[in-house]
Amino acid sequence: MAEEINNQEVQPEFHIQRVYTKDVSFEAPNTPHIFQKEWQPDVKLDMDTKTNILADSVYEVVLTLTVTCKLETETAFLCEVQQAGIFTIGNLPEPQLAHCLAAFCPNILFPYAREAVSNLVSKGSFPQLNLAPVNFDALFAQHMAQAQAQQATAEA
């Protein structure tokens, strides 16, 4: 019986324990006069992810979206959302675990964060803001390539 257990492959484990809003901020510093201007915004999106180890195989992933909208030189609004999730991830080798935490989990969190940003902007009486989907897999691959290039440069 013990040999049967040892011969079985250990299966990867992935569970979403919880998805929640960790922090929200919305500022419209130049209202109400900004509403009188022609709406030709310059919208800038910054993203960041952070991972915290909560317990063995339990991780908190926090996706931060910061949206800055300007009309010419004036800030129309600044919106920041931290969307978080607690994930159980077990039996994954390090390269796949890193990919899961940096790409797969943010892919799960992004629609929630995008909805929160859209709701805040609408409640601020600004035109609806629909953020485009993000390819976190491509961002992860780009980050890994940059890290390898920096390591190669440091070793040379």
Swiss-Prot record:
A Pfam family that this protein carries is SecB
**Where, subcellularly, is it found?**
Cytoplasm
Entry keyword Manganese: no
Superkingdom of origin organism: Bacteria
Q: Please state the protein's primary subcellular location.
A: cytoplasm
What cellular component GO annotations does this protein have? cytoplasm
Its Gene Ontology molecular function terms?
unfolded protein binding
One GO process term, biological-process aspect: protein folding
Keyword Transport set for record: yes
Q: Which InterPro entries does this UniProt record tie to the protein?
A: SecB, SecB-like_sf
Keywords, ordered alphabetically: Chaperone, Cytoplasm, Protein transport, Translocation, Transport
Record's subunit section: Homotetramer, a dimer of dimers. One homotetramer interacts with 1 SecA dimer.
Query: What job does the chain carry out?
Result: One of the proteins required for the normal export of preproteins out of the cell cytoplasm. It is a molecular chaperone that binds to a subset of precursor proteins, maintaining them in a translocation-competent state. It also specifically binds to its receptor SecA.
HAMAP family associated with the record: SecB
Sequence similarity: Belongs to the SecB family.
Full protein name: Protein-export protein SecB
Source species, please? Aeromonas hydrophila subsp. hydrophila (strain ATCC 7966 / DSM 30187 / BCRC 13018 / CCUG 14551 / JCM 1027 / KCTC 2358 / NCIMB 9240 / NCTC 8049)
Q: What is the lineage of its organism?
A: Bacteria, Pseudomonadati, Pseudomonadota, Gammaproteobacteria, Aeromonadales
